[in-house]
């Protein structure tokens, strides 16, 4: 899908024509459509009927193949868990990988070494690039250092700083700006999203995240925020109430809550949770800035392990006990 806020960055890339570098790293915040921008560029590079500086025509054979996911000169590299065409090995219980594995990169090495099918460029799209494991990243680096002619690597990363510096240095970085609030609101209105302003605020201005919040998400968020805003906060009872809630959601919501506490303490404003602005203001007034910043940094650090807690119940209890400790520091 193409998004209206991509018009300018896509046109700028297409205007470079043959001067486009062999490797681009699309980086930036999650939920603004970096992957869609990279896909639009891939379609344009492989289109056989477009004029210079124009987008893919959408009608030629190459465009039809891209629509069907079968273009012979295009490869998508992503973790098994994201692959729509994943075919589990017969007779195995192996879970789909969260990483891009070295075997996948080796397959790409064979692909780019072959003669092109359509006498045009080859395109490799890697998403999310930060999911490359160490061995896969090292194997990819060899391809980036000595790329075959007319081969384009398009890497997309939310947490680009997790990529090895050697890979980042081989790519020209593309940092698409998020849409303006007005543009995001207009787009969300066309998606028939209820309470678009709250969703957009909670998504930090990222419209694709805003539209992804479903009823179950809002219900679980409400359970969490009601629990932590009780006059007498009970961490263990709150953990029990959220026993079926994904730890990643709890950490994300708490991180946004803590960010709002810090923001209100410094600026008097609330970003992610405008529907709880009064409670945030009252809580921030009671807490010290140093303690709030320390707690926020702790939550940010938990993002690295939240996907695989050894014991979910204990993880939630510890998480909420730490918030209770923050409240006890109230001045």
Residue ranges of model-derived segments:
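N-terminal functional module detector in eukaryotic proteins
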Residues: 75, 83, 129-138, 145, ...
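Loop/turn-to-beta-strand initiation segments
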Residues: 119-123, 148-154
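Charged, glycine-rich active-site and insertion segments that engage polyanionic ligands
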Residues: 1-44, 52, 61, 149-152, ...
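Conserved catalytic/switch belt of AAA+ P-loop NTPases
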Residues: 113, 138-152
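Arginine/glycine-rich "motif VI" loop of SF2 helicases in the C-terminal RecA-like domain
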Residues: 68, 146, 193
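Hydrophobic residues in beta-strands of the RecA-like P-loop NTPase core, especially within AAA+ ATPase
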Residues: 26, 126, 140-141, 157
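Proline-centered helix-kink/hinge sites
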Residues: 72, 116, 147-148, 179
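Clamp-loader machinery-focused feature within the broader ASCE/P-loop NTPase space
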Residues: 1-135
